[in-house]
Amino acid sequence: MEEYKALLDEKMSKVLLSLESEYKSLRTGRINSSLFDKVLVDYYGEKTPLTRVANVSIPEARLIVIQPWDKSLLSKIEQAILSSDLSMNPSSDGAVLRIKVPVLTVERRKEIVKQAKKIAEEYKVAARNVRQELNSKAKKQEKDSQITEDDLRRILDDIQRDTNSYIKKIDEIFDLKTKEIMEV
């Protein structure tokens, strides 16, 4: 029974970490350099995260400065930002890109919350898939007479209880992100 708990905890922890990582790329009221983690730049034929080919700094509350390590990448970085879903318009001075970030409108904040909700739902499905996988494994062990029917019932109940707990954590992470997005 402990093996199921350990396996469930391991897989669900990965689900939660992945959710938090994906939420970092959503734009909120606060500017964060992790916004650019998912922006991919064509770097010698390879799609490379922007943060690996340039220094991203935030010198002021509403200003982002992107300084590429290789000046020849400036136009490619600019194109990558323009084609991303960040809705940002960089301006170049030949050495660095500057992005003046406008305050998010209420409508845009609501769109981002919808996007965050959709992401949370996808991760709840992933959590349920982990539950289903472990349930199948336990049922197979019972079918092969490796565990008793009572053990199976106990294992399935434990898996369900723990899955509910992890789904609640996903909801808590979503609620925190919603609060952060709607904060002015």
UniProtKB/Swiss-Prot annotation:
Q: Which InterPro entries match?
A: Ribosome_recyc_fac (IPR002661), Ribosome_recyc_fac_dom (IPR023584), RRF_sf (IPR036191)
Q: Which domain of life is it from?
A: Bacteria
Q: Name one GO molecular function term.
A: ribosomal large subunit binding
Which Pfam families does the annotation name? RRF
**Biological processes, Gene Ontology terms:** translational termination
The places in or outside the cell where this protein is found are: Cytoplasm
Signal peptide range equals: none
Q: What GO CC annotations are associated with the protein?
A: cytoplasm
KW Cytoplasm (keyword) present: yes
Keyword entries, A-Z: Cytoplasm, Protein biosynthesis
Q: Which family does it belong to?
A: Belongs to the RRF family.
What does the record give as the function of this protein?
Responsible for the release of ribosomes from messenger RNA at the termination of protein biosynthesis. May increase the efficiency of translation by recycling ribosomes from one round of translation to another.
- Its recorded name reads Ribosome-recycling factor
Source species = Borrelia turicatae (strain 91E135)
